[in-house]
Amino acid sequence: AYCFRMCLTQDPNNRIPFPKPEGYDPKQYELLIRYLQKAEAAGVKVPLMNHVMMPNGKTDTNNHGGFSTDNIGYNYEYPDGDWPTRERIIKEHEVYQKGLMWTLANDPRIPERIRKEVGSWGLAKDEFVDNGNWPHQLYIREARRMIGELVTTQHHCEHEQIEDDPVGMGAYQMD
């Protein structure tokens, strides 16, 4: 799944409230709203976003949990898509993610505790100033797999299969 990694802040002097995007469809968030209502009633705190703190009170905010900034399933056509298809997918992700943030901060059906928490954040008004304070780049986790003499798989990542002739090395947790 893909998302935009957002630069957010709680600094009231630098925070822009989450905008309600053009093309917003509240039905996209109905399942999330019901889920959060049930979880809140049961006393369960649901992780929604991963706020990695950065300098100047800003974040690199990414997906976290089963229902978050990833617009699950809407990226499938991207790897083989032509440019108009990719542009449509990028726009769908932008509208979804902006709508998600607006919903979490404003929809009266979202439990108040969550609305207050999410509403305390906003887009940093000194970032991406030429793009409505929204990141330019969709975060593409995966799109293509190189097929050759060797195809790297989870077995390689978990050291269940070791190659005798490596050409490079990297490290990152599997997600």
Residue ranges and their predicted role:
Residues 1-175:
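Flavin (FAD/FMN)-binding glycine-rich loop and adjacent Rossmann-like elements that form
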